[in-house]
Amino acid sequence: MRVNSNKKIHKMKRDPYKTLLRTAGILAIVVVVGVGVFYLCSLAVTSDYVSTRNRIENENAEAELEFNAMMNELRAEQSTALTPNTGVVSSADLPSWEKTLNDTLWRIEDESNAGLENTSTITLDRASLINGGLLLVNPWHSLPSDFSEEGLVSIGTASNFQIQVQDNSVRVFQPAYDALSEALTAAKDEAGLEYYIVMEGYRSVAQQEELFNAEMEKLSSRYSGNALIEETKKNVNYPGNSDYHTGMSFRMDVYQRDNAALNNLKFQAESEQGAWLTEHCWRFGIIFRFPTADFPKGWEDKSYKTGVSAQLNLYRYVGKAHSAAMRVLNLCLEEYIEFLIDHPHICVYEDGALKYEIVRIKIADDAQSVQLPVPNPASSYQASLDNMGGVVMAYTY
């Protein structure tokens, strides 16, 4: 305000521009201070997050070491026994098997005298167990009557035809497709190998019957009666007794358009693709289904167990735990299930660390659902009927 010569007081008008600048300045200071505070808080939160994450990772690593140490102690305790008559504790030679695969030492130990520790219980129905991956179907074990095709996927459609197929009718169950896709991706990434083609997958009993009857017709001029049936079985499995029925098997070959040199190669004996897949498929839960004498090259004849003497480029999904164990033990599927009957609890170690634990549990033939144990430390499990009166549980750690 100001006082004039008449001593009257007059209020001075404020400059609105200066007021606006002053307000803007104050707001700018508030914003800068706010940003600074937010930045400092963000740094504190980030630092706390990193610290917490590192602490949790360290705790997890320590917990894993403690768990493996505990398992080693349990193995040590279970490998001792009282000597008869003396009562002295002595070391017992529990069976174990070792093999080096891809520069990694794999060891299998028999834990059949020990139970699972710290378990919870799950309930699974028979339908899911049938498609668990380990179902044995061969000349002596028929496809279960309650088997369902539900869940089969077209390999061509599922892969957007990135995986070559004979036609769009080539189907398998999802676990088999996932394993095949992973294996073929690795073949390309690791070895630069492409041009695989899936020639055949799931076969229905009706399709198998057509093939069987066609083979009988070809042989009918030379055989008759039971002799005709038995001779036909040597080339084509009896309907209901083919591994193709499981939806977990697929027959492979190589193919590239306008590349006759590649297309004429014998998949197993001559192509790099066949050699790589046979050597590495176990890493992805896949086995070579029907080894015969020197087919694949250097492999032992298993036809006396499988009942199949034909040279088939057939691969079968069984799951990573089982394919690793079968590779270490050098067993075909028939031998492996017999092995699990004799050794119903085994542990599989990768470079000394527990990787898989496998347990076979007897069940009633007419059981429609089964309560099964799952160790709480396990990160995942696979459950499957074996078609020989048992459920096989495989736990991954």
Show the residue positions of the predicted features.
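Extracytoplasmic cell-surface/polysaccharide-interacting catalytic and binding patches
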Residues: 2, 9, 13-26, 30-201, ...
